[in-house]
């Protein structure tokens, strides 16, 4: 599904690399994805009630929303614009949100958050928060 538009997936299970790169204007509901580099450069995408496992999720995406999702894997959601997470859970996620403009409500622990650019992140807890870039102005609230 490279460079596709107007996709509408429901109850789909997918196991494969580089899925949904450069897609636009698409909706995914009740899906289960085991993938690498999914949703890179995606625009105007909504993912609801789904499980996404794999590394480097959704880098360079724009206007992407994850709602009631489980996200698992290293370095997810980096270099994003207008990224939203609504009531999501994260497992085994480290170095998340690097250089992203994000509004996130995460109902779980995050291993590490690295230099989110702007917005706010609410999570139950995090092992480490790395904000060593002076441009990282995101509000991070734990608890």
Predicted segments — roles?
Residues 1-143:
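Long, distal/terminal scaffolding or interaction modules
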């Amino acid at each position: 599904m490279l460079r596709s538009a107007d996709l509408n997936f429901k109850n789909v299970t997918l196991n494969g690399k580089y899925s949904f790169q450069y897609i636009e204007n698409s909706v995914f509901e009740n899906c289960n994805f085991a993938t690498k580099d999914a949703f890179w450069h995606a625009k105007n995408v909504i993912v609801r009630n789904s499980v996404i496992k794999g590394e480097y999720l959704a880098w360079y995406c724009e206007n992407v929303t994850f709602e009631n999702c489980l996200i698992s894997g290293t370095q997810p959601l980096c270099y994003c614009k207008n990224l939203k997470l609504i009531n999501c859970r994260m497992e085994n996620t480290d170095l998340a949100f690097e250089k992203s403009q994000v509004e996130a409500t995460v109902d779980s622990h995050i291993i590490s958050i690295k230099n989110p650019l702007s917005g706010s992140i609410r999570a139950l807890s995090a092992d480490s928060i790395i904000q060593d870039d002076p441009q990282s102005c995101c509000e991070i609230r734990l608890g």
